[in-house]
Swiss-Prot record:
UniProt keyword terms in alphabetical order: DNA-binding, Transcription, Transcription regulation
Identification of the protein by name: Uncharacterized HTH-type transcriptional regulator YazB
GO molecular function, one term: DNA-binding transcription factor activity
Entry superkingdom: Bacteria
Domain HTH cro/C1-type: 10-64
Organism: Bacillus subtilis (strain 168)
Keyword Transcription: yes
Cross-referenced PANTHER family: HTH-TYPE TRANSCRIPTIONAL REGULATOR, METHYLPHOSPHONATE SYNTHASE
Length: 69
């Protein structure tokens, strides 16, 4: 469940900032297949990937994080 929420948020911010999966994966230094797994919620992103994604998207990791209930 948590992986799905992270994946949806990463995908939404990626699209909002105009990145393709290929371009975003390259900027993160990961494969497109790993990014796809994360975005589909099949893989929980590591703390390093979360921070790298936030840096590439020019947002804070807190903004990228799912809201707490």
């Amino acid at each position: 469940m948590e992986a799905e929420i992270w994946g949806r948020r990463i995908r939404a911010f990626r699209k909002l900032k105009g990145y393709t999966q290929e371009g975003f994966a390259k900027a993160l230094g990961i494969s497109v297949s790993i990014l796809g797994e994360i975005e589909r919620g099949n893989r929980l992103p590591s703390a390093a990937i979360i921070q790298d994604a936030a840096d590439v998207l020019n947002i804070s990791a807190d903004e990228l994080a799912p809201p707490e209930k």
